[in-house]
Amino acid sequence: MNVRRAVAPVLVGACCACTAWAANLRNIEVSRESGRYHLVADTHLAAPPEAIREVLLDFDNDRYQRISEIYKESGYLPPDNDGTPIVYTRVEGCLLFFCRSLRRVERVEVATPNLIRTAVLPDRSDFKYAVSEWHLDPEGNGTRLRYTMDLEPSFWLPPFVGPWFLKRTLLHGAPQAVDKIEELAQEAERPTQEGGGATANADTR
């Protein structure tokens, strides 16, 4: 398995370029402090926020495999006691000779239509701590997608897996996932646009 593609799940867990603006991964920053990694990514996607949100929340029936082949399982579990949705993902990846299957069970909160928050349940995951936020803001004919994550794995990582190595790796592998998210969002939006066009045509008769 390619290390550059497989390392992404360690941090990210967590994208038909047929429009004027293709997906544009503007920036990725990775830092580490006291064993905890911090990731910030800034992207433009040529699709509306509601379509991107639909893709990001579509965990059922292992459908996260559509975003990246590193996802082996994904789905919704029974909700938490307060009714908050809980999702499960499992990814497989290798860092050179170091290979693992990584589980994450997370609470998913749609705080606003354009803000998704997640928080890992450590006793059911391979991470001591992990929280993330997806900010989806309208921008031009598409969406500015800002992603932040703080993560502390509960397993040993080789010493060479530092911020510089992870940033280089993510810059190599992340654009494909970003392009796929954009493509899936455009596909989800297309039936709506076609339906609206059909209605408009009917009204002019």
Task: Set out the residue ranges of the language-model regions.
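Hydrophobic pocket/interface hotspot
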Residues: 52-56, 62, 108, 118, ...
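Glycine-rich portal/gate segments that line the openings of hydrophobic small-molecule binding cavities
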Residues: 32, 36, 44, 74-124, ...
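Sec/Tat-exported extracytoplasmic proteins
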Residues: 47-49, 56-63, 91, 169, ...
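Extracytoplasmic/secreted envelope proteins and their assembly/folding machinery
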Residues: 49-57, 133, 174-178
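Hydrophobic ligand-binding cavity/cleft-lining segments
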Residues: 18-84
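Bacterial N-terminal signal peptides
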Residues: 8-17
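Beta-strand/loop substructures that line and gate deep hydrophobic ligand-binding cavities in soluble
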Residues: 120-172
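N-terminal secretory signal peptides that target proteins for export/translocation
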Residues: 1-3
